[in-house]
């Protein structure tokens, strides 16, 4: 038998009939319609809004009032401003190791980021994990170069 659009049928059991609630005891969902006896959840206009906790201050309104929530996947950097790089000589290479030797960074736990605060008077080759736009412009304007290091 060939199937045409007017002879197509859905498989039996694939489409469930909608329950007609409140249409008599014989219908199986009469009287209280499966909502129980009394209470807010059995009334008309039933569902409360998402996040409603029965009048108690809901979680989504409590949380911002509490302090010290840690930012998930926060990027931390060991930061240093451009004005500190004036301690180096012309054509020096600035990286985490050289900054530790100079005493500008003590314990390099995090990747290095160069910030653009202050003036730079020295031509340097700076190797860091991140630069601000202003820092990159100032280093290149002083004749230096910026090299990005990959995080491993």
Swiss-Prot record:
HAMAP family: Ribosomal_uL15. Transmembrane segments: none annotated. PROSITE patterns: RIBOSOMAL_L15. One of its GO terms (cellular component) is cytosolic large ribosomal subunit. Part of the 50S ribosomal subunit. This is Large ribosomal subunit protein uL15. Residues 1-57 are annotated as: Disordered. Pfam families: Ribosomal_L27A.
């Amino acid at each position: 038998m060939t199937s045409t659009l007017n002879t197509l049928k859905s498989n039996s059991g694939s489409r469930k009939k909608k329950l007609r609630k409140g249409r008599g005891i014989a219908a199986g969902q009469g009287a209280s319609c499966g909502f129980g006896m009394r209470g807010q959840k059995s009334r008309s206009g039933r569902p409360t809004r998402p996040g409603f906790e029965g009048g108690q201050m809901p979680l989504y309104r409590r949380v911002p009032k509490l302090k010290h929530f840690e930012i998930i996947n926060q990027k931390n950097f060991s930061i240093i401003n451009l004005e500190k790089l004036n301690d180096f000589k012309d054509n020096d290479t600035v990286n985490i190791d050289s900054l530790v030797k100079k005493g500008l960074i003590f314990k390099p736990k995090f990747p290095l980021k160069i910030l653009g605060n202050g003036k730079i008077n020295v031509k340097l080759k700076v190797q860091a994990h991140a630069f601000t736009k202003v820092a990159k412009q100032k280093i290149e304007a002083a004749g230096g170069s910026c090299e990005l290091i990959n995080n491993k």
